[in-house]
Amino acid sequence: MANFPASLLILNGKSADNQPLREAITLLRDEGIQIHVRVTWEKGDAQRYVDEARRLGVETVIAGGGDGTINEVSTALIQIRDGVAPALGLLPLGTANDFATSAGIPEALDKALKLAIAGNAMEIDMAMVNDKTCFINMATGGFGTRITTETPEKLKAALGGVSYLIHGLMRMDTLTPDRCEIRGENFHWQGDALVIGIGNGRQAGGGQQLCPTALINDGLLQLRIFTGEELLPALFSTLTQSDDNPNIIDGASAWFDIHAPHEITFNLDGEPLSGQEFHIEVLPGALRCRLPPDCPLLR
């Protein structure tokens, strides 16, 4: 792999003392691969490190962390307007790793690193909310959002993605739907939603397949709404198929407009955004990402 160009790894501070990662990087450096490592400490670090990556001339910026880290790095990359932006590499080190998991990124650190450095760079979509905030994986609203934002950090650290399910079951007594209206291309729905998923990717909340048919290079966002009493399918990986369940509503569009009579909260790759009006649109081919050749999220 010695002929591959340099990469810069932006590592979430929580993983700074990851000894297996240190060993994997050392082995690759011994093979002649140049890998710069930068550790995030506060919001805005990812943007600064992407700027540094441009100055260094690296061809890949690797996001080492969970969905939030991937979001920060990818958002910084798509803001590059002059010249060709570095490709995005994925190194899943977070609690849930929903985007990387659904994209087929290897769990083994050495294999994930090699893919992030040497894999084929494919153009993929991102999404933007209210012309400001971006997400690469999914926007979720309703009860599921409250669970993912309220799950204690110690529980997530101990149990990983399963912690969301356990905390959700503990909070079943607080279950209330969000009334809203959603419009898209050839789509209109109004009612009470327990869970809303608008996906560029397929899963959120620690492995829940909220948008099981979503693709990251089709120029569309997938929508899934859970209504009525159908919370459990959202928590248990959608046990019932949407084609025979009237309480699961699906849609696809390049954009969605959401209006609510009261404030609701969406979780964008782990970051909450509250309001009553949301305009969500896809950004086709917004960045290049190094993915496995059999990535299930590609058409």
Swiss-Prot record:
Q: Does the keyword Nucleotide-binding apply?
A: yes
A GO CC annotation given for this chain: cytoplasm
Q: Which organism is it from?
A: Salmonella typhimurium (strain LT2 / SGSC1412 / ATCC 700720)
Specify the superkingdom: Bacteria
- Give the enzyme class: transferase
Put simply, this protein is called Probable lipid kinase YegS
Q: Which cofactor does it need?
A: Mg(2+); Ca(2+)
Gene Ontology MF terms in the entry: ATP binding; lipid kinase activity; magnesium ion binding
The cofactor remark states: Binds 1 Mg(2+) ion per subunit. Ca(2+) may be able to substitute. 2 Ca(2+) ions are seen in the crystal structure; one of the two occupies the same site as Mg(2+) in other family members.
Alphabetical GO biological process terms: phospholipid biosynthetic process
